[in-house]
């Protein structure tokens, strides 16, 4: 008789290989889950790389910053791999990987743009919301500047409107360090190599 018990998801299986998958919009729910997985993997082994695969259209700035801050908080190197698209907050997370360990596949695309926000309420509420989004725009540009070597002014100018980058353009800009067609060409086999190899 076949086992009818609950089967672990493919994402649980990937986690055993220290792979975290962000394959959707960045939201509070998946940001909390990704941050928890980063902390779990760091607690299990603070020296082994953690792999974050990204195929995301972006999403919530505050949720994305929770992931970003956790990536910086753990002692592990974070290997990022962009597959499909890394747009908006997805771009920031891809770029936030450990320098030298940021990868993109040949057909992936990266989107840089300024943060979006919808405003409503009283004039005071709208002013407060506008100040918050301007602060976040400044902070996101500073992070991208530090990670790419571009000036904050250049990042702001380049992201003033939606700007899509091919894999090669993303490499040239400094969002990533390598273009790879195979996990075998990624540090640690992209998380697919047996432990200790």
Swiss-Prot record:
| Enzyme category, top tier | hydrolase
Q: Give the EC number(s) listed in the UniProt record.
A: 3.4.21.92
Q: Which Gene3D superfamilies match?
A: 2-enoyl-CoA Hydratase, Chain A, domain 1 (3.90.226.10)
**Which keywords does UniProt give here?**
Cytoplasm, Hydrolase, Protease, Serine protease
One Gene Ontology BP term is: protein quality control for misfolded or incompletely synthesized proteins
Q: Name one GO molecular function term.
A: serine-type endopeptidase activity
Q: Which Pfam families does the UniProt entry name for this protein?
A: CLP_protease
The record's InterPro entries line, in alphabetical order, gives: ClpP, ClpP/crotonase-like_dom_sf, ClpP/TepA, ClpP_His_AS
Q: Where is the active site?
A: 88, 113
- The main place the protein resides is cytoplasm
Q: Which domain of life is it from?
A: Bacteria
Locations listed in the record: Cytoplasm
Reactions performed catalytically: Hydrolysis of proteins to small peptides in the presence of ATP and magnesium. alpha-casein is the usual test substrate. In the absence of ATP, only oligopeptides shorter than five residues are hydrolyzed (such as succinyl-Leu-Tyr-|-NHMec, and Leu-Tyr-Leu-|-Tyr-Trp, in which cleavage of the -Tyr-|-Leu- and -Tyr-|-Trp bonds also occurs)
Name one cellular component (GO) term: endopeptidase Clp complex
Q: What does this protein do?
A: Cleaves peptides in various proteins in a process that requires ATP hydrolysis. Has a chymotrypsin-like activity. Plays a major role in the degradation of misfolded proteins.
The family line of this record is: Belongs to the peptidase S14 family.
- Can you state the subunit structure given in the record? Fourteen ClpP subunits assemble into 2 heptameric rings which stack back to back to give a disk-like structure with a central cavity, resembling the structure of eukaryotic proteasomes.
Return the protein name. ATP-dependent Clp protease proteolytic subunit 1
Lineage here is: Bacteria, Bacillati, Actinomycetota, Actinomycetes, Micrococcales
Report the gene name: clpP1
